[in-house]
Every structure is written in structure tokens, then in C-alpha cells.
Swiss-Prot record:
InterPro entries: Cyt_P450, Cyt_P450_CS, Cyt_P450_E_grp-I, Cyt_P450_E_grp-I_CYP2B-like, Cyt_P450_sf, Cytochrome_P450_fam2
Modified residues (Phosphoserine): S128
Gene Ontology annotations of biological process type: epoxygenase P450 pathway; xenobiotic metabolic process
GO cellular component: cytoplasm; endoplasmic reticulum membrane; intracellular membrane-bounded organelle
Taxonomic lineage: Eukaryota, Metazoa, Chordata, Craniata, Vertebrata
GO molecular function: arachidonate epoxygenase activity; heme binding; iron ion binding; oxidoreductase activity, acting on paired donors, with incorporation or reduction of molecular oxygen, reduced flavin or flavoprotein as one donor, and incorporation of one atom of oxygen
Organism: Canis lupus familiaris
Main location: endoplasmic reticulum
Protein name (record): Cytochrome P450 2B11
């Protein structure tokens, strides 16, 4: 008994000493931040409304670069376009590491192009960019794929005959099929039961990853991982998707012709076979599955969620939708397919799409980076291995760059002559070496899908515009729009 009392006293004394010391001195002069508690970190400074609210409040007190302890994890937050650009572009190599998202870490464990680090990441990113270019990303062929998929959606929407719909499934299916065509070499019918199951898994998983419980898991995952929670459902969902991808890989193996690769998986299998004698090769089964999952997840969720926000905003602001209808009618007309060449002639529609991305703010706290070496940044020392969050919300809502950031206003992207203007704080895909792999294809999809739908349909809601609520369903790693109902009413179209 005496020994246990002594041990307890020693533990309490140690905790008190840590509390008295505040920030660990061994790491030099870290950016400022609230004093952490042992184990709990800055839990007491966290807002009940989630991590984003917490970080924005701390920014007001500590400035654009500050230190936060997410439980025992030391992290640095970057706020505003200047700090984010200085880190991710001006010091690109030092900030090019990938941090962890606790709720998906057990699934990826540092594999796959998104969550890899070091030479693994560089190798997989080079291969992924080159291969996706070879199979159409950024070329006319992918434009044709998007146009064809948009027409498939138009046919599905015509079948609804103006009946109120939740558009989530339609937008998920449409965007997923573009990635499927590049990665798997095929598209799926909208009623395919396996495809329907996948779409549901993606939707549910993204909502869970962005939930408040997952944000709490981010702080205390080393403890909470032993208990039931949303993290286990996320794990099970993503494992089921990985099992589907593995089945697709096996089908590709059985029918592979090395002289005529059909898609991303074929190209990877050919490279894998070439390097099979190299024990250190990164081209192995695990990296293939996790890279395909990363491309599939990111390529589906980002664009489809942006479109969900976009059409909700069209219901909220019908006068903006009317201007888009007019521009579509003037530039494209009713009888031909919208093309990427039309974008330069449609500055208002392009500005609306930019503003949807800005206002939608899909990844408000960004995907965490990690510094690859000790670095002096703005007079502070950030030690190697420190996770860094580029708070994209702080750039997309900076009043120095967007006059009224809380208001949806396409004029944020129009000059005095009505032409599209660039804004350096517009970074929905992040910036630097870790910029979203699919930025190019996402921009194409948003323009072609958005204009094709509004060329063929006007949109309506049973609710008055002033009664439509834009309050997000979740704000965490991702920001999800509320669930809503919409009618697609035929305008004649193609």
C-alpha cells in the first residue's frame, strides 16, 4: 500500500511540474499558444462547436501562426493566405510532409498517395500524375467523358419529372463515374446495387469523418480507439471499399495485356511487375489499394459536395440562377453540349462556381501537413515531425481579400467590367507540393456538370428562398451542406 501511495504522489508531482512549465522548452521557441495541460493538451480551449471555431478564436488572440496541443499532439496552425503561402510555397520542401487524420490513420497507415511521406509519397505522386494524364486528366478525352456522364445524369433527372429529390445520390454517382473511368476503366449504371452501396459508404464515411465525435477522436484517439465509436464505423466502411477495389484489381490481373493498359490499375500492375525484383519498390499491392481508395474518395466527395452546396445556393438566390440561365442561353444555347471552351465566354457563371467553392469551404481546416526538418519560420522554431494545419477557411473568408466573406456574392470574383478576376486567397484545393492531385479534373467537372444541368433544368424548392437554411450539417475535417429537397424542371435542353 505504501508503495502505491508513493507512486501516486510521484505521478501527481510530475503532472504538476509539467503544468508549471507550460510549453516544453526542449523544442525551443515555438509559435505562441495557450498553455497545455498534461495529456489533455488544450482541451479546455476547444469550442463545443468544433475545431474550426476553436482555431479561429485562438487566431484572434495569438495571431496567424500559433501552437495548439490536440491532446498530447503538438500542432501548429497557419491562418491567412500570407502565412499559408509562406509555409507551403516559399518553404515548400520543409512543409511537404503529411500529418495524420486520426480517424482514418488505421486504414491508411502511411500508405497510398495522399497519406504517404518521403520517397514513397514522391514516387506515388509522380506516377499518379503521369498516369492520370495518360488516361485523360487535363486532355480532351476527359472532357468528353464528363460531357457523356453529364448527359447520363440529365436522362436520370428527366425521369424524376420534377418530383422533389435529395440530389446527393445523383451528384455522387456522376462524379464517382469519372474517377471510375480513369481508375477502373469503366462506369457504373446508377442502379447498379454494388455501385449504390459504394456511394452510400462514401457519403456516410465523409459525414462521420467530419462529425464532432471524430473531432474529439482527433484529440484523444490513443485512448478512445479502445472504445466503440464513429471511428470504428469509418474503419469498417473504408475496409469494405478497399475490398471492392481489391476485387477490381484481381479482375484486372486476370485480363491484363501489358502492351495495352486500359486504366490506372493496369498501368500500376505493369509497373509493379517491372519492379517485382526490387525489395524496396513502392509499387506493391498495399500502395495500389490505398492510392486507388484515396483517388476514389477525394475525386467523389469533393466535387459532389461542392455541387450539393451549389444547387442549394441556387435555390436560396434565384436571381443568381436567372443570370446563369441567361448566360447559358446566350453563349451555348439549348441544342449543343457545354464545352470547356465556353468557360472563357461565361464570366458570370465561372464567378458563381468560384464563389460556390469559396463559400462552401469544403475542407475548412485543411489536410494536415508535417514539417520534414527543423525550420525557423517567422522567427519561431518548428521542430521536425510537427504537424501543421493550413486553415483554408481563414484564407477563403479573409475580409482583406473578400469584401463580405459571410455573404454569398459572385462579385467577389468579378472586376468592374464584369470579367473574371483572380484572387490569390482563393485556395480551395490548397497550394504547394501537396495541392490536390485532381484540381484540374475537379475544375472541369464543376463547370461542365453545373452548366449542363442548368442548361436543361430550372431548379425549384417548396420553401421560400428566405426560409432556406444554409447551416452546415457538419463542420470538421469537411464541411457538409444540410440535407435538402430540390425539383429539376425541364427547360427543353438538348
Amino acid at each position: 500500500m505504501e508503495l502505491s501511495v508513493l507512486l501516486l504522489l510521484a505521478l501527481l508531482t510530475g503532472l504538476l511540474l509539467l503544468m508549471a512549465r507550460g510549453h516544453p522548452k526542449a523544442y525551443g521557441h515555438l509559435p505562441p499558444g495557450p498553455r497545455p495541460l498534461p495529456i489533455l493538451g488544450n482541451f479546455l480551449q476547444m469550442d463545443r462547436k468544433g475545431l474550426l471555431k476553436s482555431f479561429l478564436r485562438l487566431q484572434e488572440k495569438y495571431g496567424d501562426v500559433f501552437t495548439v496541443y490536440l491532446g498530447p499532439r503538438r500542432t501548429v496552425m497557419l491562418c491567412g493566405i500570407d502565412a499559408i503561402r509562406e509555409a507551403l510555397v516559399d518553404n515548400a520542401e520543409a512543409f511537404s510532409g503529411r500529418g495524420k487524420i486520426a480517424v482514418v490513420e488505421p486504414v491508411f497507415q502511411g500508405y497510398g498517395v495522399v497519406f504517404a511521406n518521403g520517397e514513397r509519397w514522391k514516387t506515388l505522386r509522380r506516377f499518379s500524375l503521369a498516369t492520370m494524364r495518360d488516361f485523360g486528366m487535363g486532355k480532351r478525352s476527359v472532357e468528353e467523358r464528363i460531357q457523356e456522364e453529364a448527359q447520363c445524369l440529365v436522362e436520370e433527372l428527366r425521369k424524376t419529372e420534377g418530383v422533389l429529390q435529395d440530389p446527393t445520390f445523383f451528384f455522387h454517382s456522376m462524379t464517382a463515374n469519372i474517377i471510375c473511368s480513369i481508375v477502373f476503366g469503366k462506369r457504373f449504371g446508377y442502379k447498379d446495387p454494388e455501385f449504390l452501396r459504394l456511394m452510400n459508404l462514401f457519403y456516410v464515411s465523409f459525414a462521420l469523418i467530419s462529425s464532432f465525435s471524430s473531432q474529439m477522436f482527433e484529440l484523444f484517439h490513443s485512448f478512445l480507439k479502445y472504445f466503440p465509436g464513429t471511428h470504428r464505423q469509418v474503419y469498417n466502411n473504408l475496409q469494405e471499399i478497399k475490398a471492392f477495389i481489391a476485387r477490381m484489381v484481381e479482375k484486372h490481373r486476370e485480363t491484363l495485356d501489358p502492351s495495352a493498359p486500359r486504366d490506372f490499375i493496369d498501368a500500376y500492375l505493369i509497373r509493379m511487375d517491372k519492379e517485382k525484383a526490387e525489395p524496396s519498390s513502392e509499387f506493391h499491392h498495399r500502395n495500389l489499394i490505398d492510392t486507388a481508395l484515396s483517388l476514389f474518395f477525394a475525386g467523389t466527395e469533393t466535387t459532389s459536395t461542392t455541387l450539393r452546396y451549389g444547387f442549394l445556393l441556387m435555390l436560396k438566390y434565384p436571381h443568381i440562377a436567372e443570370r446563369i440561365y441567361k448566360e447559358i442561353d446566350q453563349v451555348i444555347g439549348p441544342h449543343r453540349l457545354p464545352s470547356l471552351d465556353d468557360r472563357a465566354k461565361m464570366p458570370y457563371t465561372d464567378a458563381v462556381i468560384h464563389e460556390i467553392q469559396r463559400f462552401g469551404d469544403l475542407l475548412p481546416i485543411g489536410v494536415p501537413h508535417m514539417v520534414t526538418k527543423d525550420i525557423c519560420f517567422r522567427g519561431y522554431i518548428i521542430p521536425k515531425g510537427t504537424e501543421v494545419f493550413p486553415i483554408l477557411h481563414s484564407a477563403l473568408n479573409d475580409p482583406h481579400y473578400f469584401e463580405k466573406p459571410d455573404v454569398f456574392n459572385p462579385d467577389h470574383f468579378l472586376d468592374a467590367n464584369g470579367a473574371l478576376k483572380k484572387n490569390e486567397a482563393f485556395i480551395p484545393f490548397s497550394i504547394g507540393k501537396r495541392i490536390c492531385l485532381g484540381e484540374g479534373i475537379a475544375r472541369m467537372e464543376l463547370f461542365l456538370f453545373f452548366t449542363t444541368i442548368l442548361q436543361n433544368f430550372s431548379v425549384a424548392s417548396p420553401m421560400a428562398p428566405e426560409d432556406i437554411d444554409l447551416t452546415p450539417q457538419e463542420i470538421g475535417v469537411g464541411k457538409l451542406p444540410p440535407v435538402y429537397q430540390i425539383s429539376f424542371l425541364s427547360r427543353g435542353g438538348c
